């Protein structure tokens, strides 16, 4: 008799995705981040669900309800900090996952890659709206500044901003709708992740060499299930260490002050994972130009497959491209640092140079270098 997992309509899907899936025999630790992102999403949905049971999305009580969760709810402080720092772990895994895709040419799977870019936008939107919910100073002013950027859109801008706010400023209506969206988006993200996997399993996984691995496949279980479990344990170790030893390390002290529309914080800045995009936004003196650069800094990922000029898929055997890739990583770290600094000399010029280099590397320097490497193959 055939095994039930191979015949049952539901178990058959799980079996073909996580058990009998033919996987390349040489995929490295960089391929662990997909499963880690799945774990992060589950952690966020579960902790978020328990937080939503005690949270109230009203400007008068939101801040107090978060305080109540931390002080009076059983292990409320743990749930709250797991959720807040879980977002940071989520973004660390996301950035490493995208970086892996860029390095090893995984973007050649167009549908998988484009859904991944869409997922990145969805996760960023969710995180932004979640940051508004505690209704601290940085929540309020972050929401005001970022939503105000839409006013740069010609003709419909100011109407659009008021429509999103549900009034003439960030207020009760804004908080309520942000909570509603913050609650529903993770489930949309989960559905998109399912589609992401569906398209990935159509073509099969890429591998470090960038060559076809059809001749050398191994079953996903037990080889990669055990490898993924190790990754998950390390992720949980990192997350719990952060939560139990320094839960406020990545947060902003201003967010422990109740939102006050009459008092602007000296430095308005988003969470650390948005700082690189925020630095690009600030480096352009024009409002509309800044907004376009902000959107393009992420949207540029969708263009990457069309800029692939190399005869090789992966960067594994392309030393010049490798060098440029790590320059790009250093550039993004520089932008992250600049995003957290005040708008003054020398940070302004460093931010502008780093922003120009970011776009130049992806759009011009890397494709040209790939062409040069193609010529090296002939020698």
Curated annotation (Swiss-Prot):
Organism listed in the record: Sorex tundrensis
One Pfam family, short name: Cytochrome_B
Record-linked InterPro entries: Cyt_b/b6_C, Cyt_b/b6_C_sf, Cyt_b/b6_N, Cytb/b6-like_sf, Cytochrome_b, Cytochrome_b_C_euk/bac, Cytochrome_b_N_euk/bac, Di-haem_cyt_TM
Keywords assigned by UniProt, alphabetized: Electron transport, Heme, Iron, Membrane, Metal-binding, Mitochondrion, Mitochondrion inner membrane, Respiratory chain, Transmembrane, Transmembrane helix, Transport, Ubiquinone
Complex formation: The cytochrome bc1 complex contains 11 subunits: 3 respiratory subunits (MT-CYB, CYC1 and UQCRFS1), 2 core proteins (UQCRC1 and UQCRC2) and 6 low-molecular weight proteins (UQCRH/QCR6, UQCRB/QCR7, UQCRQ/QCR8, UQCR10/QCR9, UQCR11/QCR10 and a cleavage product of UQCRFS1). This cytochrome bc1 complex then forms a dimer.
Gene for this chain: MT-CYB
GO molecular function: metal ion binding; ubiquinol-cytochrome-c reductase activity
Keyword Methyltransferase part of the UniProt annotation: no
Residues reported to bind heme b b566: 97, 196
Membrane association type: Multi-pass membrane protein
Subcellular location: Mitochondrion inner membrane
Note: Heme 1 (or BL or b562) is low-potential and absorbs at about 562 nm, and heme 2 (or BH or b566) is high-potential and absorbs at about 566 nm.
Binding site for heme b b562: 83, 182
Annotated GO biological process: mitochondrial electron transport, ubiquinol to cytochrome c
Cofactor (UniProt): heme b
Residues the record lists as binding a ubiquinone: 201
Cofactor info, note text: Binds 2 heme b groups non-covalently.
Protein name: Cytochrome b
GO cellular component term, pick one: respiratory chain complex III
Top-level taxon: Eukaryota
């Amino acid at each position: 008799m055939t095994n039930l997992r191979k015949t049952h309509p539901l178990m058959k899907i799980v079996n073909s995705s996580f058990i009998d899936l033919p996987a390349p025999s040489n995929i490295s630790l960089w391929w662990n981040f997909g499963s880690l992102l799945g774990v992060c999403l589950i952690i966020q949905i579960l902790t978020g669900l328990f937080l939503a049971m005690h949270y109230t999305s009203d400007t008068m009580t939101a801040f107090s309800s978060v305080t109540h969760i931390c002080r009076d709810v059983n292990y409320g402080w743990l749930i709250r900090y797991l959720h807040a720092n879980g977002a940071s772990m989520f973004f660390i895994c996301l950035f490493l996952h995208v970086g892996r895709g860029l390095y090893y040419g995984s973007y050649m799977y167009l549908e998988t890659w484009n859904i991944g870019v869409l997922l990145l936008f969805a996760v960023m939107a969710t995180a932004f709206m979640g940051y508004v919910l505690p209704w601290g100073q940085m929540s309020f002013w972050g929401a005001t500044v970022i939503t105000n950027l839409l006013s740069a859109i010609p003709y419909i801008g100011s109407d659009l901003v008021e429509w999103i706010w549900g009034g003439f400023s960030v207020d009760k209506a804004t908080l309520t709708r942000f909570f509603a969206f913050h609650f529903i988006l993770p489930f949309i993200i989960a559905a998109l992740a399912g589609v992401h996997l569906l398209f990935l399993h159509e073509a099969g996984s890429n591998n470090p060499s960038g060559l076809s691995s059809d001749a050398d496949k191994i079953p996903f279980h037990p080889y990669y299930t055990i490898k993924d479990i190790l990754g998950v344990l390390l992720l949980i170790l990192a997350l719990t260490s952060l939560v139990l030893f320094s839960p406020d390390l990545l947060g902003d002290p201003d967010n422990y002050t109740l939102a006050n529309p009459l008092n602007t914080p000296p430095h308005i800045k988003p969470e650390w994972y948005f700082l690189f995009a925020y630095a690009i936004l600030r480096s352009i003196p024009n409002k509309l130009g800044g907004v376009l650069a902000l959107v393009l800094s992420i949207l540029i990922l969708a263009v990457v497959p069309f800029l692939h000029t190399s005869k090789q898929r992966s960067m594994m055997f392309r030393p010049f491209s490798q060098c440029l890739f790590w320059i790009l990583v250093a550039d993004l770290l520089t932008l992250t640092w600049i995003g957290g600094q005040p708008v003054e000399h020398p940070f302004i010029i460093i931010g502008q140079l780093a922003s120009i280099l970011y776009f130049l590397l992806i759009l011009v320097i890397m494709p040209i270098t790939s062409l040069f490497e193609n010529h090296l193959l002939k020698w």
